[in-house]
Amino acid sequence: HFSIEVDKDGFDVKRYPGIRDADFDLLPMIRQALEIKAKQGQKDLRIIASAWTAPVWMKDIQDWYVKGSAQNDFQGTGGVLKQEYAETYARYLIKYLQAYRQEGVQIWGLTPVNEPLGNNGQWESMHFTPATQNEFIKHHLGPLLREYPQQAPQLLIYDHSRDQLEQWADTIYGDMETAQFVHGAAVHWYESSFRVFEEVFDRVHQRYPEYAIIHTEGCIDDLGNDAPPGAADPQGFKESGWFQNDEFWWNKRATDWAYSVNWHGVNSADHPAYAPVHRYARNIIVSLNHWVGGWIDWNIVLDSRGGPNHVGNYCGAPIMIDVETGSVYYTPVYYVLAQLSK
């Protein structure tokens, strides 16, 4: 991800700083991928965009996030969008779409925000409830997308853990004023390291068969990290030896964010150690067999540590590269994705 900074003083949504980040310009990679795809004669490369947060001055906490600590019982937050800036934030998203279009890149899908339930203040986020996202789409983002001068992106609601999809679907799909703007829902896999929640997909599809379900993010997270503050870690487990080592990927040597936590509302029994190859294969196959129309890994390629990542949330990826030596490692999950993409 990258940041598009806008200043509150004199902010005008007619003026936009552009999408070229000096340190992390995505456009060359996207253009190269589009060129490759165009020569294949298959379906278009579809890009889904998801902002992690509004600019800080649009939020109640006036910051990117507040970390969890002993002072707040380790309950960090990303804050919420101030109601007076709902229209401004919606126009900010539209300007992003237009900026990419001016560069020759059509964004296929859009979510109102990444992970609206938050991440306990570990990095940038912004919270919505089903009700507040419903109102935001109904009165602000939806109408603006309807007015989009060319082909508008498909709007995907939610974009967080699968287990709570039903509540969001019932609230938003159940409101026809909002549902008219929506293509479907986006989900992630982080609420368990082995459960797929296919029963949730079945129930949502049974009630709302006209709406798509797309898995927009999953990865091996917290790779080689210590347990976070406020989490019990009696075994002191920490991954190691994943680069140029297929054995790591085929055996139960990976853990996720909730492997040993004792936070309220988190069942650590749903987060046992796992074999990355098996988790990927099972999750993709079961998801596609239960109405999920597409499955996207969070990363394409990372360095050998699992970064770069500005908050140290190192992750596994299909391709990992030692930037010092230039050694390229196609991990076993690369071949899982390759096989299931055929």
Please report, for each region that a protein language model flagged, where it lies by residue.
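N-terminal catalytic cores of secreted or lumenal carbohydrate-active enzymes
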Residues: 1-108, 128-131, 139-142
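Short acidic/His/Gly/Ser-rich catalytic and metal-binding motifs that mark active-site loops
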Residues: 2, 55-72, 116-122, 165-167, ...
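Extracytoplasmic/secreted proteins, especially bacterial periplasmic and envelope-associated proteins
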Residues: 25-28, 32, 84, 88-95, ...
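A short helix->loop->beta-strand "cap" motif at the edges of active sites that frequently abuts
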Residues: 38, 42-45, 153, 208-211, ...
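A structural signal for short, well-ordered beta-strand segments and their strand-loop junctions
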Residues: 47-49, 109-112, 215, 295-297
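Short glycine-enriched loops at secondary-structure junctions
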Residues: 51-56, 113, 161, 301
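Active-site neighborhood of glycoside hydrolase catalytic domains
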Residues: 85-112, 116-226, 230-254
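Aromatic/acidic polysaccharide-binding cleft in carbohydrate-active enzymes
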Residues: 215-339
